[in-house]
Amino acid sequence: MTLHRTTVTKRLFALLASTSLIMTMGACSSANETQSHETDSPSTATATDAGNVVIFTPSDGITISQQTPLSKWEKLVPEIVSSLKDNDVKGANITVKAAPSLDKQSQSVQDYVVNHVNSTSDDADSSDKTTLVVAPVADTTESDRQYGDYVSHAITWNGSSSDEDAQDYAQSAERLVSALQLAQNEGMKVVLVSNTLQGFTPDVYVPMTTAEQIGQLQAKQLVSKLELDKTSSDNPKHIEVLLPYDAANESGSTADATFAQGVFKGIWSVLGPYFKDGKAVSPSGTLTSSSTESDWVSVAFDAAKSERVKSTLAGRLGMDKDTSRHTRIDGIISCNDYVAGYASEELNDLGYTGSAADINPSITISGIVDNITGKKDLKKQSVPDPAQAPESDDGDSDTEDTSDSLDEQNSQWPIITGYGAYVSSIPNIVNGKQWMTALENRKTLASDIAQTCVCLLYTSPSPRDRQKS
């Protein structure tokens, strides 16, 4: 069973520059090796001894940059535990184990399942039911980790590969699948979270945000803010896509491009029609009216270092050598907050001014009245774009005043989108330098997982019942 996809859509929400945010942030801690601990809480009259929940998650991914997203496993797991307790599962019946690699995780799951099966066989009176919650450790690149931990990956492998690293990975993955299949055969329930496993069908799959959804969300926000539906092909919007992608992983092998391709697929499913109709253009020419989702590589770049982000954007704008005149840019899809932050820095260094708040605001007379009476926020109506781009209007465009005026227009700050809700990105969102970010609703996600576990505990037969049957 898979939790319905709309559940993910409801959990995923965007934080916009115009939104008033109240956020509670917990202290951060790192987990660099396998950890196991039982969560203790006083027994209550309502708590149930109906079964155990064992949670296996990755240790938090470590990025080279100190900038990290809020969507970390170390923040989600306590929420799941808390939600399980709220659903009357005893703290003593909840176990959490974290591992930094698929190899370590597969061994941890295998050890638990084998030990549990042996102890159940030795204890004829055992009536414990067990649900395993497993978020398989994905082999991700640095650029993939920039999106945070709450994103879905399909874990696949080639068992016949001649590459030694690939063989080790396949062995770990197959060990995990075998352990989970043994668990199911012994009556345990398995809930897979976020990542799928090649050749394994869990009792329940809880999806998280996909790469395609990340791309779609940002593109839709950009289309809405720039009002592309009202844009004329004679005065198109100038848009760049900065797609982070590591061509090689940490071991030097060719990296899996699936995630980067998925992000661009989502972006292009929204922006493609506007480029085709001429309502959107790319200043760098990396995207054209004939581009397809297969052209993702044209906008991909290595974003492991901040200077690469900045130099790539300057190059796209043709300002890597000459910064005397600005290139018009209306929107930048940065894909994640790491890229968005350095894109904002570079635009500031290049002399772009203003903020996202200056683009298509909307204030009306009725809005002023409603604002005074407290019915709704004040919104400013935007001035319509001219039918033609300023540089194509009639008149003497060779004068110095006209040139300066055009450069002033071109230097206006663009819409910048991101993803991951980095703590470091919040100031940019507040001051309008970054238009939006997004993240999963952690509490809702934890509640979904906890309620699924409770349902499985109450509906699955106990080991004693299975022996009788």
Give the label of every model feature segment.
Residues 68-86, 104, 214-218, 255-286, ...:
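Short, solvent-exposed amphipathic alpha-helices that sit
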Residues 458-467:
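Conserved small/polar residues in nucleotide/adenosyl-binding loops
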Residues 161-171, 198-224, 251-259, 431-443:
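Short beta-strand elements at the ligand-binding edges of bilobed clamshell
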Residues 131-150, 166-182, 294-409, 414-424:
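Hydrophobic alpha-helical
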Residues 28-36:
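Bacterial lipoprotein signal-peptidase II cleavage site
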Residues 149-166, 176-212, 244, 425-428:
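Flexible loop/hinge segments that line or gate small-molecule binding clefts
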Residues 42-83, 87, 93-120, 135-140, ...:
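Extracytoplasmic "Venus flytrap"
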Residues 49, 173, 177-180, 206-238, ...:
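Hydrophobic alpha-helical segments within soluble ligand-binding/sensing domains
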